[in-house]
Amino acid sequence: MGNLFVKKPKITEVDRAILSLKTQRRKLGQYQQQLEKVIEAEKQAARDLIREKRKDRALLALKKKRTQEELLKQVDQWLINVEQQLADIELTSKQKAVFESLKQGNNAIKAIQSEVNLDDVQKLMDDTAEAKAYQDELSAILGEKLSAEDEEEILAEFDNLESLLIVEDMPEVPTTELMPEEPEKMDLPDVPTKAPVASNETTSTKRKVLEEPLEA
């Protein structure tokens, strides 16, 4: 008889790391979708603030959106790397790469978790003391993160968005052809169709004049 008790393979640290990578991949995929919604909300907030003539806050919203878009690019690249590693049949021999990806994944999750709160978008719109403190803190943080090139591109985005809103807010030109107005009808008396008949008095007067003798 064969051995009925088959020894289970030992789970290695690499196996655990691979499982963690898969878990991270799933979480980051969910966070990506949430962050995309936040980015859209930031853009809408910038549009609203431009309409309200609040340039400083609109620029702050666009700056925050820029950093979030950069974070999305980093997460996308990390996910691509993980997919390549998980598809590699020799993955178990690349322990260093696995643990490095796991470390990067943890950092990515921490970074993206702090950016997926839609309530923070509303703080850009509010005028409360709490919102003002948040705006000042965010402005200081973004000032350190963004380069001069980023600042120029954000200003260009602001100008472009402002121009688009001016066009959007213009009154619409009617597309249907205007029909000419019909002239107003006036109630006039009917035109007589027969010659007028003189009265008897008028006829007698004319006859009398004709019958009177002319003076010598």
From Swiss-Prot:
Locations listed in the record: Endosome membrane
Disulfide bond sites: none
Coiled coil: 16-90
Gene3D superfamilies to which the protein is assigned, alphabetical: ESAT-6-like
Region (Disordered): 173-216
Keyword Transcription found: no
BP term (GO), one: vacuolar transport
Membrane topology: Lipid-anchor
Membrane recorded as keyword: yes
Signal peptide: none
GO cellular component term, pick one: late endosome
Keywords: Coiled coil, Endosome, Lipoprotein, Membrane, Myristate, Protein transport, Transport
Subunit structure: Component of the endosomal sorting required for transport complex III (ESCRT-III), composed at least of VPS2, VPS20, VPS24 and VPS32. Interacts with SKD1.
Family that this chain belongs to: Belongs to the SNF7 family.
Function: Component of the ESCRT-III complex, which is required for multivesicular bodies (MVBs) formation and sorting of endosomal cargo proteins into MVBs. The ESCRT-III complex is probably involved in the concentration of MVB cargo.
Protein name per Swiss-Prot or TrEMBL: Vacuolar protein sorting-associated protein 20 homolog 2
Protein's organism: Arabidopsis thaliana
Lineage: Eukaryota, Viridiplantae, Streptophyta, Embryophyta, Tracheophyta
Gene expressing this chain: VPS20.2
